[in-house]
Swiss-Prot record:
Family of this protein: Belongs to the uracil-DNA glycosylase (UDG) superfamily. UNG family.
Lineage, broadest ranks: Bacteria, Bacillati, Actinomycetota, Actinomycetes, Mycobacteriales
GO cellular-component term (any): cytoplasm
Protein name as annotated: Uracil-DNA glycosylase
Active site: D68
E.C. number: 3.2.2.27
Role: Excises uracil residues from the DNA which can arise as a result of misincorporation of dUMP residues by DNA polymerase or due to deamination of cytosine.
Chain's gene name: ung
Entry's localization field: Cytoplasm
InterPro entries: UDG_fam1, Ura-DNA_Glyclase_AS, Uracil-DNA_glycosylase-like, Uracil-DNA_glycosylase-like_sf
């Protein structure tokens, strides 16, 4: 993640939306370079840290908020919960998401864990914290990403466009006041992690409920099927 202008590393709409935190993003770049220099490294790879902001800002219609990237090298790829097509087995959180997808909509289990088709349809797959130290979950909480992702969501809810939010876990739930103030409908449940999925994630029907809410807003539903 180099020190380039935002307009060179993300969608122009997102560059404008995140301009108020441009200095924070640059500071996070400095932090990540220092992590590399100290031999600690970080995930995902630098070119993928801001990947969620490469799809058009104006097209976002569903926001899915997670916590932080998978801490396993080779797993995180810049979209929350998603992994590269060649990752096998997929992370257990993602397996739980696919189980709920099947139960909710009856879609067959996807052949891989790549959620790019959702992103291509305007589903913003955003972690509250955008990086992590390898093997150390939650290690970059409180380092500065929270201000960036909060600004991203503030900008989203300020648009005059249909939006539905899906909040998975306690970190994501901290965004409820922002959504409530802007009258953005949201679906809240436990995180799909094996540690918490049985406490309210399973049976929450987030995919069908999101489409029902989009329909109420006059927006096209998402085709949640994956190859």
């Amino acid at each position: 993640m180099g020190a380039k202008p935002l307009s060179e590393i993300m969608d122009p709409g997102w560059a404008q939306a995140l301009e108020p935190v441009a200095d924070r993003i640059r500071a996070m770049g400095d932090f990540l370079r220092a992590e590399n220099a100290a031999g600690r490294g970080y995930l995902p790879a630098g070119e993928n840290v801001l990947r969620a902001f490469q799809r058009p800002f104006r097209d976002v219609r569903v926001l899915i908020v997670g916590q932080d990237p998978y801490p396993t090298p080779g797993h995180p790829m810049g979209l929350s919960f998603s992994v590269a097509p060649d990752v096998s087995p997929i992370p257990r959180s993602l397996a739980n998401i696919f189980a709920e997808l099947h139960k909710d909509l009856g879609h067959p289990t996807p052949s891989c864990g790549d959620l790019t088709p959702w992103s291509d349809q305007g589903v913003l797959l955003l972690n509250r914290v955008l990086t992590v130290s390898p093997g150390q979950p939650a290690s970059h909480r409180g380092k500065g990403w929270e201000a960036v992702t909060e600004q991203a969501i503030r900008a989203l809810v300020a648009r005059d466009e249909p939006l539905v939010a899906i909040l998975w876990g306690r970190d994501a739930a901290t965004l409820k006041p922002l959504l409530t103030e802007a009258e953005v409908p949201y679906i809240e449940s436990a995180h799909p992690s094996p540690l918490s999925a049985s406490r309210g994630f399973f049976g929450s029907r987030p995919f069908s409920r999101a489409n029902e809410l989009l329909d109420e807003l006059g927006a096209e539903p998402v085709d949640w099927r994956l190859p």
